[in-house]
C-alpha cells in the first residue's frame, strides 16, 4: 500500500496547492448532506427568517450551536438587532416553505405560509418542525461573506418522530424518523 509523504513542518506543500475556485468548492459542498432549517427571529429589529443548512452543534455544556448567516441576507439586520433566533429543523413536506425562506419572498409572505407560535425568547417556532432550538446569540464571528453565530440553546420544542429533511446534491431528501430503542 502506498503512503503519502508527510508535509514538512513549514507547511510549504500548502503554498503550492492550486487555488480552488468558488464553483469547485460549491460543487463539493453540494455533496455534503445537511439538515434543512428555517432560522427565525422577532423583537425590536423586526420579524425575519431565512433557510439555513450551515448549522451544527458546538458543545452540550452549555448547549450551543452555530448558524452561518450571509451578511447580505434580508434577515441579517433583524437577527443582529434582536439577538435571539429559533432554529427550526424542517420535516419532509416542508420543501416549499424552505424555498420561500431561501428566496427573495417578503417576510410577511414567508410567515403566512406556515403555522407559528412564539418561543420564550420571542422568536417564531414552526408548528410541525422536527425539533426547534430556541437560542440567544452569545457571539458572532465574521468569516468572508458570512457571520458565524454562536447560539446558546435556552429551550427546545420537539415535534415527534416525523421524517426529517436534508439537502444533498442540490435536492431535498426525506430521512427516516428517530429509531426506536
UniProtKB/Swiss-Prot annotation:
Top enzyme category: oxidoreductase
Entry superkingdom: Bacteria
Reaction it catalyzes: FMNH2 + NAD(+) = FMN + NADH + 2 H(+)
GO BP term, pick one: nitrogen utilization
Cystine pairings recorded for this chain: none
Coiled-coil ranges from the UniProt annotation: none
Keywords: Flavoprotein, FMN, NAD, Oxidoreductase
Functional note: Catalyzes the reduction of FMN to FMNH2 which is used to reduce pyrimidine by RutA via the Rut pathway.
Protein name: FMN reductase (NADH) RutF
Organism: Ancylobacter novellus (strain ATCC 8093 / DSM 506 / JCM 20403 / CCM 1077 / IAM 12100 / NBRC 12443 / NCIMB 10456) (Starkeya novella)
Taxonomy of the source species: Bacteria, Pseudomonadati, Pseudomonadota, Alphaproteobacteria, Hyphomicrobiales
